[in-house]
Amino acid sequence: MSKIIAIANQKGGVGKTTTCVNLCCALKMKGKKVLILDCDPQGNSTSGMGVDKYSTPGTYELIAKKADIYDCIRKTPYGDVIPSNKELSGATVALVLAEKREYVLKDALQLVYNDYDYIFIDCPPSLELLTLNALVAADSIITVSYTHLRAHETS
C-alpha cells in the first residue's frame, strides 16, 4: 500500500523537483519501492532520474488516456518514473474536457497503488488542473519554500 505525496508550491525555483528526486533516491537506497509521477512540463524530475524526457508514453499520454499507466513507467536504478516534457502543457485541454477531471491522476494511480511504498508527484509551479489533480490524488502534501521574505510573493 502506497503513500502518495505531492510536492507542491505555486512558486517556481523553490526546490520542489530537488526535494522530489532526493527523497525518491534516498528511499530507494533504503530498499523502498518508489515512483515519481512528473507533472511538471519542464520535465526536470524525469531528467534528474536519468530518463530522457522525450521518451513516450508519459504523463501527458496518461492524462489524455492515450496510454496505460504500466506503459508509462520507466525503470531506473534510482526508482521508477513516469516522464514529462513540454507536451504536458497540452494536458490542461484534455483535463478540461474530461469527466471527473480532478480525479484523472487519482484514478490512474489506483492501478499501481499496491506496487510501490511511495509515489511522489512533482507538481508544476502553478495552481491549475495538473496541480489540482496531484493534490486530489495525494495522501500528503509537502510544500517546499524558502524562508526569506520575498519567497512568499508570487509573480
Q: Where would I find each of the regions flagged by the language model?
A:
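P-loop NTP-binding core
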Residues: 1-150, 155
